[in-house]
């Protein structure tokens, strides 16, 4: 999952990436978000939920997952109602925990079967996640809630897949060109985060935005992959999306990065063009808030280590304390 909280690489700037990132933000027409700070109230509500429900939050790692969920909900969905924002924050916190919880692999293997049968889960983490999925239709149109749940179940399957020895022994090749996107669309949960942009009470017409979901998913995946590339390169990671796709397409990683950037910009342009044709401006506004908040989260969050690039470190300075995740 793109927001995994494991990050221990040393911090140095890579000059070539600095110019690439600066150009990306310029070409995307990124604007620093400026919204009312709801973080303290949301954090208090999440803590109350954790105490009441038994959801894990007291360990150092659990607190980091908690904070990422809190931070991204504030950044991505700033004008959502408090109840919707809280639901998304809890979902994100628990999903990120599941993604990093290698020790819970045996329990996770049976998650989907138990979920489908309505059986209790063996841990507080998985039980709370199952309950969160079951309550999606409170905040989202029933069909949309179904898509969110299905995307989340695919995320669980992809998490298990990424831990399988068979996956790690695969030799990437040009004959499996679509494999990187297949895995990414499932492991990153982009469909759920795209649908989260449009809660039922504010965005009741699913026809107004449904056609844009595939491009929103592309933006969500690729922008994360681009802005994670710095810390992953420093850590020596070669199993990320950019490097895997580069092998499949027989390109150099930096050349692949440039292509993915162009595809990201094009995907956003199509979404903006589509939503701008709608008579109700709320759909375009909601996307614009998410689009800018998504970049802001990555640029200012400590774990992405992008503060080493002068052109990016100054972006969002005014609001950095609010979204310090």
Swiss-Prot record:
EC number(s)? 4.2.3.-
Location of the motif DDXXXXD motif: 99-104
Name the positions where Mg(2+) 1 binds: 99, 162
Q: Which GO terms describe its molecular function?
A: carbon-oxygen lyase activity, acting on phosphates; metal ion binding
* Residues passing through the membrane, by range: none
Motif annotated as NSE/DTE motif, chain positions: 224-232
Which controlled-vocabulary keywords does the entry list?
A: Lyase, Magnesium, Metal-binding
InterPro entries reported in the protein's UniProt record: Isoprenoid_synthase_dom_sf, Trichodiene_synth
Pathway it acts in?
Sesquiterpene biosynthesis
Q: Which amino acid positions bind Mg(2+) 2, per UniProt? A: 224, 228, 232
Quote the SUPFAM superfamilies the UniProt record gives: Terpenoid synthases
Q: What class of enzyme is it?
A: lyase
> Which cofactors are required for activity?
Mg(2+)
**Which family does the similarity line name?**
Belongs to the trichodiene synthase family.
Domain note? The conserved DDXXD and NSE/DTE motifs are important for the catalytic activity, presumably through binding to Mg(2+).
Function summary: Sesquiterpene cyclase; part of the minimal biosynthetic bip cluster that mediates the biosynthesis of bridged polycyclic sesquiterpenoids derived from sativene, isosativene, and longifolene. The sesquiterpene cyclase BipA acts as a versatile cyclase that converts farnesyl diphosphate (FPP) into (-)-sativene as the dominant product and (-)-isosativene and (-)-longifolene as minor ones.
Indicate what this protein is called per its UniProt record: Terpene synthase BipA
- Its source organism is Cochliobolus sativus
Output the lineage of the source organism: Eukaryota, Fungi, Dikarya, Ascomycota, Pezizomycotina
Q: Which gene encodes it?
A: BipA
